[in-house]
Amino acid sequence: MANDKLIVTPRRGLAAIVGLATASLLLVNIPKEESGRTVKVEMAPDGAATVQHISGRQYLRAYLDIVGVPTACDGLTSYHGRKIKIADQFTEAQCTAMLEEELVVHAKGVMQCTPGLALTYPRRDHARFAAVSLAYNVGVANWCSSTARRMFNASRITAGCDALLPWNKVTKNGKKVVSNGLAGRRSRERAICLKDAA
């Protein structure tokens, strides 16, 4: 339902891992990238987030993504280690809670292998956002072996932001092909990331 407010509780929440600004960026941008929907997020000082659906389709029933993987909510292909099945259905509240939990899992992985994005570094909110957004899309293991991660750990923020761009391909019929959707997403992540390089 549009305009319903959902509270995301801080239970060692996202803001504790990546900071308030990065958590807000993730909770606003991931639904836009994954589902095309618009949400409004208000962050409390304790890290609790109030998420309000404004517009756009919500995928409460599972669907097949561009490469045929069952997906639900805001890009979830699994939850608590269980793959999403095409028959799965969720409520809006479940989707919001699941998104926050999955972002926490991905953020922890990113922060563990990327000490160059530690909260003690100033002006890293946008780079942290880009790193977690990419990891949410391609997996933590891929992030941790990426050139972007190596650049961020070396405090080469611009180079790290630029290294996001090659992650624009999907596998179709056994071949890697550029996805216009992923190319656009990587460009948007890079643009946000570069705000820390200025």
Can you describe what each PLM-predicted range is?
Residues 63-66, 123-127, 153-154:
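Extracellular/periplasmic catalytic domains that process cell-envelope and extracellular macromolecules
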Residues 49-84:
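Substrate-binding/active-site groove segments that recognize
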Residues 27-38, 50, 128-135:
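Short, functionally critical alpha-helical segments immediately adjacent to catalytic or ligand/cofactor-binding
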Residues 2-32, 96, 100-122:
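Export/targeting segments at the very N-terminus of extracytoplasmic proteins
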